[in-house]
């Protein structure tokens, strides 16, 4: 299994959903970087299960225990290792269906790849529970980015076809983004909360689930971060986004809508703003040629419906090599979207840290050469 990311801001995640613990090792963190434990705990609480009626009944405190790399609230420069204990597992819920593959899950693909040796309980290492270490790493990254004036935030753009307003692609600001983080159900239009919650409740009552869309933005990102082709901002963010189990699509700026525009509509006209340059629109989501252009970086991620549903589903029993019917017991989210908001913020923070560090390394190597 490949459980690592990055060349500069390096992550390795570990653990399984029903194992003793999950966690992450962050390497490359500058010595002296601030580690605000209260801030980190607040971000972890936003993702933690059991905090909202739309979420699973499995309650986990997601309390982080830092094992190395920190002292007196600062990074020491050594690898930062954080562990989160799994304190509320019910593995018995999975004993009766170990050989029956859950549709929509990684059960069958993982069974084939790892020859049945992987831990299937709660999805094992494939579980969305492994996004908790990503939120820890993302919180550390966000603290670094805040020192550079970069703020990140996100909101629920849609659930089950009920749509929130979109970010102002030019005018979204840090105050708006910080305000969203104070809500368990972050929306730009609060009137959309009731119909969204109703859609989730209806799915739960029908022993089903629903998906949605999350829109994420970063402001304060300077122009010139990223590289063309394989080091593009879109490439790095997308790699991390698709590492989140529920994400099935991602779009930057106007995304697929750009395909229906003419160039005269899609191009972001530019003008001088004091000594700097700004764009009059932001159809490209703050990125052109794979490099940030100084506008807000904005993307949307599609979150599929939670695959664990209580209604009967057709599947196969790999032990008996026959068709079967599966009814999934256990505690599952009828909608993962509200808890995934902070996860999307975290992966954007990790990506921007990696990109900023890569840019700093390149500039350090070429200092005094390209003059």
Identify the meaning behind each predicted range.
Residues 1-371:
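Generic N-terminal targeting/processing segments that precede catalytic cores or assembly contacts
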């Amino acid at each position: 299994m490949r459980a690592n990311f990055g060349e500069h801001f390096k992550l390795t995640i570990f653990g399984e959903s029903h194992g003793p613990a999950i966690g992450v090792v962050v390497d490359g963190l500058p010595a002296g970087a601030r580690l605000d434990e209260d801030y980190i705990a607040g971000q972890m609480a936003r993702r933690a299960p059991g905090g909202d009626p739309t979420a699973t009944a499995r309650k986990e405190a997601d309390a982080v225990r830092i094992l190395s790399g920190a002292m007196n609230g600062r990074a020491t420069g050594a690898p930062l290792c954080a562990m989160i204990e799994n304190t509320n597992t019910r593995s018995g819920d999975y004993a009766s269906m170990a050989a029956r593959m859950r549709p929509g899950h990684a059960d069958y693909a993982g069974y084939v790849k790892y020859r049945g040796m992987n831990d299937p309980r709660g999805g094992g290492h494939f579980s969305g529970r492994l996004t908790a270490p990503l939120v820890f790493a993302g919180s550390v990254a966000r603290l670094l980015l805040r020192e550079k004036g970069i703020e990140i935030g996100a909101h629920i753009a849609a659930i089950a076809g009920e749509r929130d307003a979109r970010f102002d692609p030019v005018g979204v600001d840090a105050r708006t983004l910080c305000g969203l983080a104070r809500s368990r159900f972050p929306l730009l239009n609060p009137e959309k909360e009731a119909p969204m919650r109703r859609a989730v409740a209806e799915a739960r009552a029908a022993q089903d689930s629903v998906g949605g869309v999350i829109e994420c933005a970063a402001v304060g990102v300077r122009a010139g971060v990223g590289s063309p082709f394989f080091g593009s901002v879109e490439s790095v963010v997308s790699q991390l986004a698709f590492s989140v189990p529920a994400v099935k699509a991602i779009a930057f700026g106007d995304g697929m809508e750009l395909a229906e525009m003419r160039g005269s509509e899609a191009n972001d006209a530019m003008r001088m703003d004091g000594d700097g340059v700004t764009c009059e629109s932001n159809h490209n989501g703050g990125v052109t040629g794979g490099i940030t252009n100084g506008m807000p970086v904005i993307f949307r991620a599609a979150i599929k419906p939670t695959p664990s549903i209580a209604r009967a589903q057709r599947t196969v029993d790999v032990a008996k090599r026959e068709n079967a019917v599966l009814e999934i017991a256990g505690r599952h989210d009828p909608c993962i979207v509200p808890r995934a908001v902070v996860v999307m913020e975290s992966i954007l923070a990790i990506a921007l840290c990696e990109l900023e560090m890569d840019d700093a390394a390149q500039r350090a190597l070429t200092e005094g050469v390209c003059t």
